Design a protein with these regions (language model features):
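Compositionally biased, low-structure terminal segments
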Residues: 4-5, 45, 89
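Mature N-terminal segment immediately following signal peptide/propeptide cleavage
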Residues: 35-55
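Bacterial N-terminal signal peptides that target proteins for export
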Residues: 1-13
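Cleaved targeting-peptide boundary
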Residues: 27-34
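Sec/Tat signal peptide C-region and signal peptidase I cleavage site
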Residues: 21-27
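Catalytic glycan-binding domains that act on GlcNAc-containing polysaccharides
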Residues: 53-265
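Cleavable N-terminal signal peptides
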Residues: 13-15, 25
């Protein structure tokens, strides 16, 4: 628990960051392409300093590159969650997630028993999210995390949403939980279950290293508990908590169905 005290500091900082953002998002001029990115970064550095980001985080910001691949992926988000829940589950390999999830539930029984006794969250939903997000850790992404999340904070579509996560990513760099070279998913998500940086600050447990399986799964349970998970109600009785994880209806329904199938074996 070398990071225990630091972890409490990170959580407190995360709560403050996530409450800040409406005004901060407007402090630097957003853009719709790479042309203004470097100028924006210089302005955003002042925003970051004001939020408490220190030298390592500011250095990571200075080194961030405009992430064209992230912008392309962001433009396609709605399409990825279109169609019926059945077609979505088929595209995402739900039957494989269920089969492997059942196997992992057995082979990691001690871990899932600990998670359930600590957080009240049943194994199925954790396994469903883990399988859906990264194929149980098989692919956690190759996009530079700082560049991705900073680009999204700069982009004019949703700066109010992504600015707190950009600040959080820089704070995580300051504290050593991320580095300027850390990689993850296209929208800056991190680790086995793909937390956005602000959620790492607020809900991550222990040393916040979400590339560690146990830390990631316990952090996921902590997130769900904080979003109203009701022990004993099962996944389908906890749609509100699942909605906190992902706002897409087809995703929520798929997770609930997969979780129920895993827990009901």
């Amino acid at each position: 628990m070398a990071f225990f005290a630091k972890g409490k500091m990170i959580a407190a900082a995360g709560a403050a960051v996530l409450s800040l953002l409406a005004g901060m998002a407007q402090a630097a001029q957003c853009g719709d392409g790479a042309a203004g990115f470097e100028e924006w970064k210089a302005d955003f550095a002042n925003v970051a300093k004001g939020a408490g980001v220190k030298n390592k985080g500011l250095s990571a910001l200075a080194g961030a590159k405009y992430a064209s691949a992230t912008i392309k992926a962001d433009r396609a988000v709605k399409k990825a969650f279109s169609g019926s829940v059945e077609s979505f589950m088929q595209r995402r390999g739900a039957s494989t997630i269920i089969s492997k999830g059942r196997s992992l539930k057995k082979s990691n029984a001690a871990l899932f028993n600990k998670i359930e006794s600590t957080y009240g969250v049943s194994p199925g939903v954790i396994l469903a999210i883990w399988g859906m997000e990264t194929g149980f850790g098989g692919f956690m992404g190759k996009q530079n995390t700082v560049s991705a999340i900073v680009t999204l904070a700069y982009d004019c579509r949703r700066p109010g949403f992504f600015t707190p996560h950009a600040i959080a990513a820089l704070m995580l760099v300051d504290r050593g939980a991320l580095s300027a070279g850390s990689v993850g998913a296209m929208h800056g998500e991190i680790g086995h279950t793909q937390f956005l940086p602000g959620n790492v600050l607020k809900y991550g447990v222990g040393n916040k290293n979400l590339k560690d399986k146990s830390t990631a799964l316990m952090s996921t349970a902590n997130f769900l508990r904080a979003h109203g998970w009701n022990p004993g109600a099962g996944a389908e009785g906890n749609m509100g908590a699942i909605a906190g994880w992902n706002s897409a209806g087809v995703y929520q329904q798929a997770i609930a169905r997969i979780a129920t199938a895993i827990d009901g074996q």
